[in-house]
Each structure stands twice: as structure tokens, then as C-alpha cells.
Regions:
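Amphipathic alpha-helical segments of tetratricopeptide repeats
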Residues: 1-2, 33-45, 79-93, 126-137, ...
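Long, leucine/valine-rich, helix-dominated scaffolding and oligomerization segments
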Residues: 15, 24-35, 48, 68, ...
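Short juxta-domain linker segments that transition from a proline/glycine-rich
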Residues: 1-32, 173, 177-180, 186-189, ...
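Amphipathic alpha-helical repeat scaffolds of TPR domains
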Residues: 4-21, 50-72, 98-110, 142-156
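Long, low-complexity regulatory tails in eukaryotic proteins
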Residues: 110, 122-201
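Residue-level detector of the short coil/turn that links helix A to helix B
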Residues: 22-24, 73, 116, 156, ...
Length: 201
């Protein structure tokens, strides 16, 4: 690893640490992450899809920037993230970059769901689930199942319909078991809490 990349990675981890420990704001973290990424590649070049090769580190930095951005900037960056993942798959096949694909596309799916684009969100989550099953990976299965469940619930709310408690409970049970197998304690606790809320309805 080159010295520049070493410094870049250390600065990246430090920025996330400062944000997680509430020593800097999300906006300050975002500014720092942009500066870190631009030590090796301009953010604008990525947004305009003019940078053909990005290292795994640069993709992770970009993902974190997109994830922490807000408003129109977030929308623009998420579209760029979607385009990058499509290009990775077309050039290398999904198996080569599956970890990066899962991470970025799960965030894109969540963004589309929050923006009310439920079908687009579901389509991405379905692809993640399918590819994870083919490649025998469990890492993102619970998140993709929960994303689809969240979209389903939002559709029901918007239509004024009544949710199927049994269906919600069973889907959350899947999420709990998968999170447990992956030793994702925080996610397991989150799904368990949601399941208890369903039981009280």
C-alpha cells in the first residue's frame, strides 16, 4: 500500500471515529471525507462518471460521503453510486465486487425507499438477495428483507389499508435469525424491538 493511501485510510478512520464519538458533527465529517477522497480523485469526476477506475478504498470513501449527504446532493450522489455499481457489474461480474456492491446498493435501495420509490428500491433489494443466495453469502440478506418489508408497510400506510400482523411478524423473524447467524447484534436487537411492536398492535 502506498504512503498516500495509508494516510488516506488513517484520516478516513479518524473522521468516522470522531463522528461516532460525537466530537464532530455529521456536516464536519462530510467535509472531512470529501477532502480525504480528493487526495486521490476529485469528487466531481466521480459524480460525472469520468473516473474509470476507483480503488476499493475510494469506493468506500465515496459511499460514506453519499450516505451522509442530504437533500439534492444526496440524491445526486446516490444516482452516481447506482451508476458505479452497474458499471462494476458489467465490467467485472457481480462476484468480483460483491462486498462493495452489497454495501453501496443496500444504501441506494434504502434511499429510494425513503424517497417513495418503492418499486425501484425493491428491485435492488431483490437483486442483492438473489446474488447473495447464489454466492452463498448471508451478510446483507437481513437488511434487504427488512428494506422490502419497510417498503411494503409504507405502501399499506399510503393506501390506507390494514397491515397483516402475521406477515410482518414472520418477516421480522427471518431478519432476526439471519442477523443472529451473522452475529449482527445491533441489527438483531433492532428487529426484535420491531417484532415486539408488531405484537402489541
Amino acid at each position: 500500500m502506498e504512503p498516500t493511501m495509508n494516510r488516506q485510510e488513517i484520516a478516513f478512520l479518524n473522521s468516522l471515529y470522531l463522528w461516532h464519538t460525537e466530537r464532530i458533527t455529521k456536516q464536519e465529517c462530510l467535509i472531512s471525507l470529501k477532502e480525504i477522497l480528493e487526495k486521490t480523485v476529485p469528487l466531481e469526476k466521480i459524480r460525472q462518471a469520468k473516473e474509470e477506475y476507483l480503488s476499493d478504498g475510494e469506493l468506500i470513501y465515496f459511499y460514506n460521503i453519499a450516505d451522509k449527504a442530504e437533500g439534492e446532493e444526496k440524491a445526486d450522489l446516490m444516482e452516481s453510486a447506482h451508476a458505479i455499481c452497474k458499471r462494476l457489474v458489467s465490467e467485472n461480474g457481480i462476484g468480483t465486487d460483491i462486498s462493495i456492491y452489497e454495501l453501496m446498493m443496500d444504501s441506494v435501495a434504502s434511499y429510494y425507499g425513503n424517497a417513495g420509490k418503492y418499486d425501484r428500491s425493491d428491485e435492488i433489494s431483490d437483486k442483492i438477495i438473489k446474488e447473495d443466495l447464489v454466492l452463498r453469502r448471508m451478510t446483507m440478506l437481513h437488511e434487504s428483507i427488512y428494506n422490502k418489508l419497510w417498503n411494503h408497510s409504507e405502501r399499506i400506510k399510503e393506501s390506507g389499508g390494514e397491515e397483516d400482523k402475521k406477515f410482518l411478524y414472520e418477516e421480522l423473524e427471518k431478519c432476526i435469525r439471519l442477523a443472529e447467524l451473522c452475529k449482527e447484534i445491533f441489527s438483531e436487537e433492532f428487529y426484535t424491538k420491531k417484532q415486539k411492536e408488531v405484537s402489541k398492535k
